[in-house]
């Protein structure tokens, strides 16, 4: 942890953080939630595996003792047809998680049975498997039976669950009374997690069908908004987020999503973003992502101290969130001139999410600004290994090579222009690149 981060965390502990019996703060458990193996079921029932993962995610989001690591962080290891013990172990290590939650489904004497499992990290490399009690789910009672599963996992992982927390978790884990609507929702979420234009369009169709079956399905409205946002349908996304808040004014996620929209709006809507993030935090004080958003909004308004305070709370509630370390990396260098703290924050973000292009770009820019051109080239090159068409990395690499190898810089500018000239948003930058290219060619002729 950086020196400044240590000082930041020395403040008063925010409400909602779990305490041990001795009164010391207990870090939340970082968990990866995997779809349950449903290959033993008939094809039309296999959506239940993803459905259980969604139930666990919704329920555990209501407890301050857990932070969830996005399944997208596992893309480097691929997506197996079913997550068994070997896949769970690989997921645990890849995500640097404290535990992975998974399991399988089968039918016994015609009745559906859920077989929940978990794998905990012990020490540096050891693991401890946990097997929970089988959960029978008679026909017509699946959603009711699954609602208690998040609290059961919490207790199995030795995380205290007070009665109000258990009630809140169970309520969140039972978002609709219609199994048909929940099936569409689970299938839609599975499609959106696969990513890509076609899968997101499939997700839109499935989530819309979930809402047709149950118009009061708040979580489905929110999820539909998220997918619309991914597709670039900004206004449709906003409509779904607002529908969620109208159906359930206590649901925090859409307020945070609206904050994100305000932050990315063409106009400067930072005050509205602060209001939306603050509302999400009011509803769920330990909502780490909302604290990060609030920090970003305050930083955009020029309130550096307010931003740092928000990031501080985000770190307490979720110390393994790469986004907060990314934001700290930006503010340390740009606003406070703290080189070492910035580098360490960016490196921590990359350690937590090796595919974070933004963190690698930020680290490269800090190195470049300090004249560490070899290190900057290394970071920009890693960005291009992950995304060969990343125009920011192509542009920055060309600039850096101007300092160390003009001939290579010419090749880099030519490559940037080939890629970026097809993109309207890059037009002004392409014009600048052509000026650099002409200047370099003239210099080499002399």
Q: What is the predicted function of each stretch?
A:
Residues 192, 229, 256, 263-265, ...:
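Position-specific recognition of the canonical hydrophobic site in helix A of tetratricopeptide repeat
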Residues 21-63, 175-181, 185-192, 215-218:
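A structural "domain/chain start" motif
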Residues 213, 247, 283, 317, ...:
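Structural marker of alpha-solenoid helical repeat scaffolds
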Residues 54-55, 59, 66, 72-190, ...:
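Catalytic-center loop of serine/cysteine hydrolases
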Residues 198-205, 230-243, 264-279, 300-313, ...:
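Structural signature of tandem alpha-helical TPR/SEL1-like repeats
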Residues 181, 218-219, 252-253, 288-289, ...:
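Helix-start (N-cap) detector for alpha-helical repeat units in TPR-like alpha-solenoids
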Residues 179-213, 230, 260-264, 296, ...:
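Alpha-helical segment of the N-proximal tetratricopeptide repeat
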């Amino acid at each position: 942890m950086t020196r400044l981060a240590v000082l930041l965390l020395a403040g008063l502990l925010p409400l909602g953080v779990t305490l041990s019996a001795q009164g010391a703060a207990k870090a939340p458990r970082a968990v990866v939630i995997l779809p349950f193996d449903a290959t033993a079921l008939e094809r039309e029932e296999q959506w239940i595996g993803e459905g259980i993962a969604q139930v666990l995610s919704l329920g555990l989001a209501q407890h301050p003792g857990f932070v969830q690591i996005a399944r997208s962080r596992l893309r480097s290891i691929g997506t197996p047809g079913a997550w068994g013990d070997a896949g769970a172990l690989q997921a645990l290590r890849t995500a640097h998680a404290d535990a992975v939650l998974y399991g399988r489904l089968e039918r016994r004497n015609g009745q559906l049975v859920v077989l929940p499992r978990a794998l905990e990290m012990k020490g540096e490399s050891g693991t401890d498997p946990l097997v929970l009690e089988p959960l029978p789910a008679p026909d017509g009672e699946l959603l009711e039976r699954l609602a208690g599963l998040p609290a059961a996992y919490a207790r199995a992982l030795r995380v205290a669950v007070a009665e109000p927390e258990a009630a809140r978790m169970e309520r969140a884990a039972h978002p609709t009374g219609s199994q048909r609507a929940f099936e569409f929702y689970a299938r839609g979420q599975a499609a959106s997690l696969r990513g890509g234009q076609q899968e997101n369009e499939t997700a839109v169709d499935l989530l819309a069908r979930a809402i047709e079956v149950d118009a009061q399905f708040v979580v489905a409205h929110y999820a539909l908004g998220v997918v619309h946002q991914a597709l670039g349908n900004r206004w449709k996304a906003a409509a779904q987020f607002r529908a969620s808040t109208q159906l359930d004014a206590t649901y925090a996620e859409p307020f945070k999503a609206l904050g994100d929209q305000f932050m990315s709006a063409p106009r400067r809507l930072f005050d509205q973003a602060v209001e939306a993030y603050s509302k999400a935090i009011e509803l769920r004080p330990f909502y780490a992502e909302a604290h990060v958003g609030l920090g970003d909004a305050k930083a955009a308004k020029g309130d550096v101290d307010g931003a740092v305070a928000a990031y501080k709370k985000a770190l307490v509630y979720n110390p393994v969130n790469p986004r907060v370390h990314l934001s700290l990396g930006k503010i340390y260098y740009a606003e406070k001139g703290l080189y070492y703290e910035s580098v360490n924050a960016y490196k921590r973000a990359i350690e937590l999410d090796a595919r974070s292009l933004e963190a690698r770009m930020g680290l490269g820019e800090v190195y470049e600004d300090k004249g560490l051109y070899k290190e900057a080239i290394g970071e920009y090159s890693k960005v291009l290994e992950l995304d060969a068409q990343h125009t920011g990395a192509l542009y920055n690499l060309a600039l850096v090579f101007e300092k160390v190898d003009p001939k290579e810089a010419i090749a880099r500018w030519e490559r940037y222009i080939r890629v970026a000239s097809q993109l309207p948003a890059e037009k002004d930058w392409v014009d600048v690149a052509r000026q650099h290219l002409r200047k370099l060619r003239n210099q080499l002729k002399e």
